[in-house]
């Protein structure tokens, strides 16, 4: 009887051990499959970005601030990401695209030699903008901008200006919004020049666009109530103006800021002051073949002080030539 009982006990113990012992080969295969799946999933995120430290840091940042179990978690209602436009979301060489618009408008209006304003400094440029951007209603200006973008092409690339947006940045915008970030434009360009098309091109609605502006007034016209654009500057959203514009329109300090020039430095510094986990990214124009290469000596998008500051503070400096597999959408 004791022998039978002992045998049964040994059988029971063997069964328990068999059930509890992990199937090593199957477990290793499962782990390998999981790794492959994760790598495949990761490759579908930001596909126009080459693998490397900069892409990894961006993905890691988003993972940390969206992980509810992390001490660095940031609630969705505080996930604000701000982007410069010229040179950050679309190209800006050899002159800002809005200047092409102003020159075309000047020709249409019969203004002689408007190109002289490009060499005359800040004052003549303001005069050119006053002549070409004002003395009309906001609705009229909206229509003029839209019609121009439908037909105008860049003189060097022969592309429509809205086809000269950066594919990697479009992917980054989509990726952030998929992770419940609110994406904003904070640009030195005209706020009313950008608003007609940012929703279609970037997925950023007009109410999430901050830019430079002219003074406006309300009036009743024969066509009904309207906002009229005046020939005086109201706000310049550049350099120190960018944090001011962010406070006026957003009312919160962002946790992510992306720019490309010294004019964006204060916006990135302001974002770095957030007590929440934050990130600063600079886009460095290094690709003379697929776009333009320029930085500290450029008349457009000068990148000198910002570059040195970014190095000192371990901010991301994206190298367009090395980090981006594609520049423009195909």
Question: How does the language model describe each region?
Answer:
Residues 6-13:
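Sec-dependent N-terminal signal peptides
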Residues 24-45, 49, 56-59, 63, ...:
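C-terminal cap/substrate-recognition subdomain and adjoining C-terminal extension
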Residues 1-4:
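Positively charged n-region of N-terminal signal peptides that target proteins for export
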Residues 16-19:
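C-terminal motif of bacterial Sec signal peptides marking the signal peptidase cleavage site
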